[in-house]
Amino acid sequence: MKKKILFIDRDGTLVIEPPIDYQLDSLEKLEFYPRVFRNLGFIRSKLDFEFVMVTNQDGLGTSSFPEDTFWPAHNLMLKTLAGEGITFDDILIDRSFPEDNAPTRKPRTGMLTKYIDNPEYDLAESFVIGDRPTDVELAKNLGCRAIYLQEATDDLKEKGLEEVCALATTDWDQVAEFLFAGERKAEVRRTTKETDIYVSLNLDGNGGCDISTGLGFFDHMLEQIGKHSGMDLTIRVKGDLEVDEHHTIEDTAIALGECIYQALGSKRGIERYGYALPMDDCLCQVCLDFGGRPWLVWDAEFNREKIGEMPTEMFLHFFKSLSDAAKMNLNIKAEGQNEHHKIEGIFKALARALKMALKRDIYHFELPSSKGVL
């Protein structure tokens, strides 16, 4: 079997990068990245990745960064990590300055030639983990993917690197979960005589939404699901709105439910249950269970015929179709005077319940069922 590698940056990834001069040149500056020990130790013990540290240390060995100020902190870092079961198969340090344009300096691959075009290694299934766009660019140059230790990826879009980024997060818990349990992404295309619908989502995203159904208020409601659950959600709908809103709303619910069901995969490690009770002038309660048995309990009344362009009679139908397609039990109750706030509260409560139920625990990676099946 080919070997997989984690090419791991040092400063800003394993340890906090000193904010003033960006040099870890004293023991006093040594501070480890939050939760790196537990998660990198877990990855090292549970998964079959080789660990290769790849770091640029500007001018190491020159008067601007003497060797005797570098090695004490570096060696203590390695000793501390080793004490937690985290060791490296290789440590590669480039000493050049940026203006040198050295072939060995990240994002160039001069230090990594032994891993390139080597039949022993599977670079396509390997990752670069780092906090700078140059780390993502290194992944691109190696032919692997990147785990970007930043929340936003706007700077990657500008450089055309977004496709290389498999995960963007500042949380090592999410890094370990991603590497151990895999991605939870799905795409669904639903085409009928009445509608053509595309849905894609990432359950472990950042709440990014790109939604267009042709019904402005419906778009606004669906955006609440993505935003408040944390999932990345894209929905594109072409429906027969010239006839009626029914098919557009119903088929969107079906496609979204199917997409959630597919992305859930085995359901191992998930919380399974979720509930939320947000307050505005309305009280909205949504409880759900990903137990595999769809059912809807609906206790919400609306007096207006429409909110925006969306018929209120379709609210129940949307959640029934969603429940059936996602194979989840939904119990929804809402009270209040403002019709807009009431349905928006339901969608927000659903999103928060989803966020709770979809959460995974890789340290208790079991099926949440005494029956052994969901």
Swiss-Prot record:
Alphabetic keyword roster: Amino-acid biosynthesis, Cytoplasm, Histidine biosynthesis, Hydrolase, Lyase, Magnesium, Metal-binding, Multifunctional enzyme
| PROSITE patterns listed in its UniProt record | IGP_DEHYDRATASE_1, IGP_DEHYDRATASE_2
* InterPro entries, per database record: HAD-like_sf, HAD-SF_hydro_IIIA, HAD_sf, His_synth_bifunc_HisB, HisB_N, Histidinol-phos, IGPD_sf, ImidazoleglycerolP_deHydtase
Q: Which SUPFAM superfamilies match?
A: HAD-like (SSF56784), Ribosomal protein S5 domain 2-like (SSF54211)
Q: Does the keyword Transcription apply?
A: no
A single GO BP: L-histidine biosynthetic process
Q: Where in the cell is it found?
A: Cytoplasm
What disulfide bonds does the UniProt entry report for this chain?
none
Q: What note does UniProt attach to the cofactor annotation?
A: Binds 2 Mg(2+) ions.
**Keyword presence, Ribonucleoprotein:** no
Q: Name one GO molecular function term.
A: histidinol-phosphatase activity
Q: Which Pfam families match?
A: Hydrolase_like (PF13242), IGPD (PF00475)
Q: Where is this region: Histidinol-phosphatase?
A: 1-183
Location of the active site: D9 (nucleophile), D11 (proton donor)
Binding sites annotated in the UniProt record for Mg(2+): D9, D11, D131
Q: Which domain of life is it from?
A: Bacteria
Q: Which portions of the sequence form the region Imidazoleglycerol-phosphate dehydratase?
A: 184-374
Reactions listed under catalytic activity: D-erythro-1-(imidazol-4-yl)glycerol 3-phosphate = 3-(imidazol-4-yl)-2-oxopropyl phosphate + H2O; L-histidinol phosphate + H2O = L-histidinol + phosphate
Q: Which PANTHER family match?
A: IMIDAZOLEGLYCEROL-PHOSPHATE DEHYDRATASE, IMIDAZOLEGLYCEROL-PHOSPHATE DEHYDRATASE HIS7
The protein depicted here goes by the name Histidine biosynthesis bifunctional protein HisB
Instruction: Give the species this sequence originates from.
Output: Bacteroides thetaiotaomicron (strain ATCC 29148 / DSM 2079 / JCM 5827 / CCUG 10774 / NCTC 10582 / VPI-5482 / E50)
